[in-house]
Structures are given as structure tokens and as C-alpha cells.
Amino acid sequence: MTSEPYWKTKRLDEMNTVEWEALCDGCGLCCLNKLEDWESGEVVFTSVACRLLDGESCRCKDYPNRQATVPDCIQLTPDQVEDIAWLPPSCGYRLVHEGRDLYWWHPLVSGDPETVHQAGISARGRTVSEEHVSVEDFEDYLCDWPMTVLLQAEESGDQ
């Protein structure tokens, strides 16, 4: 008898810290700078990454201290998942919150942290660090691929 994986049986608010952190697939999309239109409230992604994002691994270079270094870094909690519309449709937190399963490329399913990159879901190779871009120039880096990577992966047959 095989038991179901924890993400299929627990709500986000029932997970312990280790389970919660493992839901992050390491795509790095959360770590892209976003711009919000003050009039419409629309949030758009840029390809400008947080200075702490490792462009190869798509993981934070200083995760334990990230909020001290980057004060506006969002520490995602179960209560926030529903309210953050910019979480990509491929996000493990979003999927579990919506009662959906994780995709084959998620490290919890594949057992390999590289599959998120192999599937083309991550930010690897698509970003520039904010250390090299003036805030005034962020608009030059607007992009929509963070919200469409899942569709692109599905269209290429990588479901």
C-alpha cells in the first residue's frame, strides 16, 4: 500500500517548515522584479532578477538572511498564496492551494532539482541581475514569459 505524498493530503497551513520549503520548485520566478501600474493595479514581470538570485541554480544566494539584505523580499506564507495573483501558474504553492497536483518536473516528483530547468519552467538563462540595471530602466525589461512558461511546456509535450 502506497501512501499519498504530503502535498496531496495536507493543506498549505498544515505543512511543517521542511514540507513548505520543499514545495518551492526552484524556478526563480518569484525573484524577478515586478512593476505595478499605480492606476490599474496590474502587475507585470521584468527579466531583472533580485541581486540574491543565483542565475544558474535559480535559488537565493543568502536565503536565511534574504529579508535583511532585500527588505521588500516577500516571505510567502500559506495565507498569502491566494492573494498574490502574480504567482506563476506553475508555482507549487499555487498548485497545491488550488487542489492540483505538482507537475512531473517538480523536484518533489522527479527527485531531481534540474528537471525544473530542463522543462523550461525556470528563470535560468533569461535574467539580468538588478545589480546591473538602474531601477529607472526596469521598464526596458518587461516580459510575459513567467506567466506563460507552463503553457509553453505543455505545448511542447512536456506534461
UniProtKB/Swiss-Prot annotation:
InterPro entries: Puta_zinc/iron-chelating_dom (IPR005358), UCP006173 (IPR008228). It comes from the Bacteria. Belongs to the UPF0260 family. PANTHER family: UPF0260 PROTEIN YCGN. This is UPF0260 protein Avi_1324. The lineage of its organism: Bacteria, Pseudomonadati, Pseudomonadota, Alphaproteobacteria, Hyphomicrobiales.
